[in-house]
C-alpha cells in the first residue's frame, strides 16, 4: 500500500522511556560528545534500524555508510574553511596526451590561487590534477573496486586519501 504524501521524519519525536534514559546516560559516560542532540538521534536511528530491519545486508550498509561518513568528516574537517575544486576526468588518459598537461597546469594554478584539489585519486586526469596541485594541496576520494584503480602516487599514503566502499558516499 502506497501513501501518496509520505514524508520521511528526520527527527524522532516519540519518547522512548528507559531507552532515552540509557542513551542520555551513555552520552554522559562517553564524555566530550559535541552536539549531543545529534548523537542522540544517530543512536536512536541505529536502534530503530536494528528493530525494524532484520536484513543483514541492509544493516551492514548502514553501518559502513556511517563509518565512512564519520571518517570523511574527520579528514575534511581541518580544511573546512579552505576552498576546494573537484576535478573529474578519465583514469585512462595517458601522460603523453595534451589534456593531461592541461589538467596538470590547472591543478598547479588552483593550488597557487589557494585552492585544494579533490580528485577520485586514480590515474590519468586525476593524477595530473593532483600532480599539478602537489600532495600538500590534494585530496583523493578513491573507491574500492575488485578490478580497477589504485590510488595515484601523488595521493598514495597521503592523510587526505579516503578509500570508500560505496560510490554514493564518495559523491
Give the residues covered by each predicted segment.
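Short, Lys/Arg-enriched N-terminal segments with co-localized hydrophobic residues
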Residues: 1-7
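Short, hinge-like loop/turn segments at secondary-structure boundaries
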Residues: 135-137, 155-160
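Active-site/ligand-binding-proximal alpha/beta "capping" segment
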Residues: 163-171
